[in-house]
Amino acid sequence: MIILMTKIEKDTNNIITKLHERGGNDKAILAALRRSNSILSRQATVVWPMLFEYIKDKDTFGENSRQTISERAIFTALRCYAVFEQGNDSERDREYDNENANSLFRNLSFLRKDERLRDALDRRAQAVLSTTNIEAVTRSLVSLTKIIKANNSAAIINYPELANDLYNFQLGFESARKVAIKWGREYFWINDNRESNED
């Protein structure tokens, strides 16, 4: 089955692929992503050349100085990527490929099988799933990415899909709730036949 990527997914995938191609030259960009809470942060200016190189569609640019929903979505996904990749030099030795990646919430569902983690994970997931505030969601997703890294550093997260979800989340209340339902299904639905990346 062929699944077509959206423009947001393609842009995110292209940026991450470019980061891999740059080898050691990406460390400043990854560090800036980790330190920046948003694209508006002064530290994020290091990221702008690469980000704006790929976000070229006229309709994705804001008419003023506000960040667009595309920029926020892609930047947040890249920030999660940078957080997960910190200290993983061996990970960047391989070509970036998201075909075998799982969504962020599917990766969390694998961790949820551990009863020691379940209650704390459920509380954090519920906080994300119950809000329509994009600022709260972006902060929580970075924290959840850190939890995945701490408990399964071999996990592969589909960052382009995450960026697309974040884009859709910002399109209004109903769209945000649809994304929350998608994430909830990925998190709570247990499929014992599907293997996690750590197996």
Pin down the residues of each PLM region.
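Interaction-prone helical segments in low-complexity regions
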Residues: 1-7
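N-terminal domain-start signal
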Residues: 9-61, 65, 76, 93
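Intrinsically disordered or highly flexible coil/loop and linker segments, enriched in small
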Residues: 24-25, 39-46, 60, 87-91, ...
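Non-catalytic, well-ordered alpha-helical scaffold segments
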Residues: 27, 31, 45, 49, ...
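Alpha-helical oligomerization segments
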Residues: 149-199
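Conserved binding-pocket/active-site segment within a compact domain
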Residues: 97-169
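Aromatic- and glycine-enriched beta-alpha-beta binding-site module
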Residues: 56, 60-110
